[in-house]
Design a protein with these regions (language model features):
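Conserved active-site tyrosine of GNAT-family acetyltransferases
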Residues: 18-23, 94, 123
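Short glycine-/small-residue motifs
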Residues: 125-128
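Vicinal oxygen chelate
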Residues: 1-7, 29-85, 89-119, 130-132
């Protein structure tokens, strides 16, 4: 048995707004779009977005656990790392867009990468990195 790759699924509060962000700001194409879900691709990278907009937890009664898996408080709790070639060039493209994470400018890391991170409209963290 050998694992081959992973596809991140990021929880978002507004699927339309988030799909537009990944398409318009980061250059992804929309491969699949249906209610509450989007599959996005750019080159060999695929990211899935799923809408976490269930507000039912706010008004529920009793002590039953919250179990829909799409509760609104989950939106923005995700993140992923994307390996790229030409991270410095990509940083120059992304920097003027105003989407960089405040504490994740382009840097050399102790674990041997050059990387930076952006945040989507829900504050999911997407880190772009290149091995040195």
């Amino acid at each position: 048995m050998k694992m081959l790759f992973a596809i991140p699924g990021l929880p978002v509060s507004d699927i339309e707004k988030s799909t537009a962000f990944y398409r318009d700001k980061l250059g992804f194409t929309v491969a699949v779009r249906k209610e509450g879900f989007a599959k996005l691709r750019r080159d060999a990278v695929e990211i899935h977005l799923w809408e976490a907009a269930d507000e039912g937890w706010r008004t529920r009664v009793g002590s039953e656990p919250i179990v829909s898996g799409a509760e609104s408080f989950i939106a923005g709790t995700g993140g992923c790392r994307v390996s790229v070639e030409g991270v410095e060039e990509w940083y120059r493209v992304v920097q003027p867009l105003g989407i960089l994470h405040d504490n994740a400018q382009l840097e050399v890391t102790p674990w041997g990468t050059r990387e930076f991170a952006v945040v989507d409209p829900d504050n999911n963290l997407v880190t772009f990195f290149e091995r040195k």
